[in-house]
Amino acid sequence: LGTSSYTFHGGEHSRFSHCLGVYEIARQITEIFEEKYPDEWDSSESLLTMTAALLHDLGHGAYSHTFENLFDTNHEAITQDIIQSPDTEIHQVLLQVAPDFPKKVASVIDHTYPNKQVVQLISSQIDADRMDYLLRDSYFTGAFYGQFDLTRILRVIRPVKNGIAFQRNGMHAIEDYVLSRYQMYMQVYFHP
């Protein structure tokens, strides 16, 4: 929320709780993909997806979005450095999964991982990150603009060859999500 919490006083929560929320949405989606779309989803990608969801904002500092342009920093690059640096505990834990696991997680965050399904679940126009922060920010600010039907979106999301897609019968839920995102930016994030 950055400085929006000064206008919306209830709008205070942590990156930690947000990352847990992104992880949970990613977990639900990968579970759905494993159950409903085993031919289109490689279940070995589920752990990577959930790990990237949990760690995606690791490089954020206080007011990070506000100060990134000022100090010419990039939280995603910092996140990748933390994940790939042999000196960090996170790197050491990820190595226990597989020797190349830290590099894979970092490549998801860098959007260079070859499986675009995984990348798009973490970072795209409709992803676990945005779904969580819209609902979370709407709840904590008391602004209802960010509300959308997550349950319906989870019912209609599906893996396709080059990413993720949504079934036509869920288009109203997708339209509602897009409008909710627009309204949150206009009414909360860019509040006059």
Where are these regions (language model features)?
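Sequence-structural signature of the catalytic-core scaffold of metal-dependent phosphohydrolases
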Residues: 1-51, 59-192
